[in-house]
Amino acid sequence: MASLLDCGAGLASANASFSTATDLSQENGLFSSWFERCSKTQIAVTIFAVLIAYDQFMYIWRKGSIAGPAFKIPFMGPFIQALYPKFDAYLAQWASGPLSCVSVFHKFVVLASDRDIAHKVFKSPTFVKPCIVPMAETLLRPSAWVFLQGRAHTEYRRGLNGLFTNKAISTYLPAQEKVYDDYFERFVAASEANKSKPMAFMRLFREINCALSCRTFFGDYISQDAVEKIAEDFYQVTAALELVNVPLSVYIPFTKCWRGKRTADAVLAEFASCAAACKANMAAGAEPKCIVDQWVLHMMESKRYNDRIAAGETGAEKPKNLIREFTDEEIGQTMFTFLFASQDASSSATTWLFQILAQRPDVLDRLREENLSVRGGNKETPFELSMLESLPYTNAVIKELLRYRPPVIFVPYEATKKFPVTPNYTISKGSMIVPSCYPALHDPQVYPDPETFDPERWITGDAESKTKNWLVFGAGAHDCLARKYVPLTMAAMIGKASLELDWVHHATSQSEEIRVFATLFPEDECQLVFTRQG
């Protein structure tokens, strides 16, 4: 009986196999017949149409109910607009809704203009990671500390916090004072060479900020030639920082991404060399004068402590900043992330600060008077950290400048998993989510008459209490490490300039038009004439 059942099962199986094979043969025959009847062009057009339909379907599915174009330009999306961004287009995008989207090539990008949604993104490290822009990991290296998450990021950042204490910052000021002396002389010389006719100062403002950063990071370990070359070449890095790049363009010679990568590699090598020189100098007993000096000093103190503990000593005093040892390459890489974060933002802030104060002599006169008073009437007195607390109006000017023309208008993140941004919208894994800072800083409900530059709102108004809207330095685990250092250096720069220089802004039809180049700049590049005060 069993054998009969087995035989029947075998026959049934054979019949089923034969039937399946026959069906497949018929299907293959149909496909073969179709392919034979179609030309190569027809096949290519069909495949292309299927890909377009898939690309369109994925865009519509990801878009869901949020604002954005109803359909996507096949494959590339608004790539041309991304290459040449217009500030008015950003304003329109932010105004279209609290969440809006675009899709460029393979990247789906959601912009968050709502303040509370921006805070949620900044404070959701389990759902998102900073990506800055897609090219950032290539330029900075994937191992850079800014891309670390969780405990690894927290511990690395804790070790860097000690570089921005009041005590540490005070050691950087003499080097910065020398930079101001040098470049203020250059500003005047440039105007004289141009026969006191207005000229664009945006390039020199980029250079002074690069010099400030490099001297603050490395002191005299870096040469002036290297500083000037980095200031000139770093433009290539900024140019590569488009929100979305052509895929694989970093491997195509002479593209923006290719040039940016070469520049980044050269800067990293220079910074690693400076780190090695610093270690040798500090090992010889030198006093710290720059950020890397302070960092290496903390490493040396930590090593001595660990050695004493390892030797069984019980009374060893634990350093305030107990950290591991870092290689020259790690130090160089970290300083490069600082330069990466500061160069364009600081250059933008400096450009607008000099332009706006030239347009507002009432503000400049009051700032000048305050800075002379805090120096006891002697304009030659160097800036000291203790002066900052005695400069309420200068601080208000800096804060209003950072609100009025924020140097960071948004911070791109990438979703590491499905992220329920709102109860009604979930962003898919791998998509970019971009919390925007500008709308919160120009909210008329929080800052009345937001398009007017008004430092007084920080003194007699209630702007100081609107902390949730103060997104200049971001929020959450990845907020700006230098949120105290940045206003300090700006106050030092403009305070010294107000006492030593006069400058006149020659307005053009493009002075108030905003160019988007990583951050915000005046379209005419700030037409000024500098002279020495009598």
From Swiss-Prot:
Cofactor field: heme
Enzyme kind, highest EC tier: oxidoreductase
A GO BP entry: sterol biosynthetic process
Keywords (A to Z) from UniProt: Endoplasmic reticulum, Iron, Lipid biosynthesis, Lipid metabolism, Membrane, Metal-binding, Monooxygenase, Oxidoreductase, Steroid biosynthesis, Steroid metabolism, Sterol biosynthesis, Sterol metabolism, Transmembrane, Transmembrane helix
One annotated GO molecular function: iron ion binding
Annotated metabolic or biological route of this protein: Steroid metabolism; ergosterol biosynthesis
Catalytic activity, reaction form: 5-dehydroepisterol + NADPH + O2 + H(+) = ergosta-5,7,22,24(28)-tetraen-3beta-ol + NADP(+) + 2 H2O
InterPro entries reported for this sequence: Cyt_P450, Cyt_P450_E_grp-IV, Cyt_P450_sf
Subcellular location: Endoplasmic reticulum membrane
Result of knocking out the encoding gene: Leads to a severe decrease in conidiation and virulence when ERG5A is also deleted. The absence of both ERG5A and ERG5B seems not to affect the ergosterol production.
Record-listed E.C. numbers: 1.14.19.41
Membrane topology of this protein: Single-pass membrane protein
Transmembrane segments: 43-61
Ranges in a coiled coil: none
Family stated for the protein in its record: Belongs to the cytochrome P450 family.
Further comment found in the protein's record: In Fusarium, the biosynthesis pathway of the sterol precursors leading to the prevalent sterol ergosterol differs from yeast. The ringsystem of lanosterol in S.cerevisiae is firstly demethylised in three enzymatic steps leading to the intermediate zymosterol and secondly a methyl group is added to zymosterol by the sterol 24-C-methyltransferase to form fecosterol. In Fusarium, lanosterol is firstly transmethylated by the sterol 24-C-methyltransferase leading to the intermediate eburicol and secondly demethylated in three steps to form fecosterol.
Biological function: The third module or late pathway involves the ergosterol synthesis itself through consecutive reactions that mainly occur in the endoplasmic reticulum (ER) membrane.
Name the UniProt record assigns to this protein: C-22 sterol desaturase ERG5B
Native organism: Gibberella zeae (strain ATCC MYA-4620 / CBS 123657 / FGSC 9075 / NRRL 31084 / PH-1) (Wheat head blight fungus)
